[in-house]
C-alpha cells in the first residue's frame, strides 16, 4: 500500500519552511548589534554636568530665585533645545569634567567632542566605522589607542582587531 501525498501539500510545506527560514534569518540579523553601539548606550548619561555656569546666567546677580535657576542649569539634558541668538545655553560650555564641549547645533545642545553627527564642529559627520574621539573622527576597529571605543588602549604588543584587543 502506497500513501499518496497531494502535490499541493508538498508545495505548501516547502513554501512554509522557506518563509520560516527567512523570518528566522531576518529577526536574528536585526538583533545583532555592533560592539561600539552597545558601548554608546552604556556610557551615555542622560545629562551633561556643567563645569561652569552658562554665559547666559553669568551676569545675573544672585538672589534666592536665581540661585534655583542657576542650580537648574548646572546640568543640561542631552539634546536640550537652544537657540544660537536668543537662548544659547550651551555656547562652548565645558561639561563632565572637561570631557564634553557643548555647542548649539540645529537648535539642540550637542557634545562636539563625542557626537558622531557633530564631531569637532556642528554638522561634521563621522564615517562608517568611525567614532568621534576628542572632536576627531577616528577608526576604532584597528586602532590600538582607541580599540572599539575612544581611549581604550591595548596592552603593548597586543593588536586591536575588529574593535577588540587581542581578537583571535
Swiss-Prot record:
Where on the tree of life does the source sit, at the highest rank?
Answer: Eukaryota
Native source species: Arabidopsis thaliana
Q: Where is this site: Cleavage?
A: 67-68, 78-79
Summarize subunit and interaction data from the UniProt record for this chain: Interacts with PRK5 and to a lower extent with PRK4.
State its role. Involved in the regulation of cell death induced by extracellular reactive oxygen species. Only the processed peptide, and not the full length GRI can bind in vivo to the extracellular domain of the receptor PRK5. The GRIp-induced cell death is superoxide and salicylic acid dependent.
**Which protein are we looking at?**
Protein GRIM REAPER
Per the record, the similarity remark reads: Belongs to the STIG1 family.
Where found? Secreted, Extracellular space, Apoplast
Q: Hey, what's the signal peptide range on this chain?
A: 1-30
The residues that carry sugar chains are 59
One Pfam family matching this protein: Stig1
**GO BP terms in the entry:** defense response to bacterium; jasmonic acid mediated signaling pathway; regulation of jasmonic acid biosynthetic process; regulation of salicylic acid biosynthetic process; response to ozone; salicylic acid mediated signaling pathway; seed development
List the expressing tissues. Answer: Highly expressed in flowers, and at very low levels in leaves.
Single GO cellular component term: apoplast
Question: Which keywords does UniProt give here?
Answer: Apoplast, Glycoprotein, Plant defense, Secreted, Signal
Question: What residue ranges are annotated as transmembrane?
Answer: none
Question: Which InterPro entries does UniProt cross-reference here?
Answer: Stig-like (IPR006969)
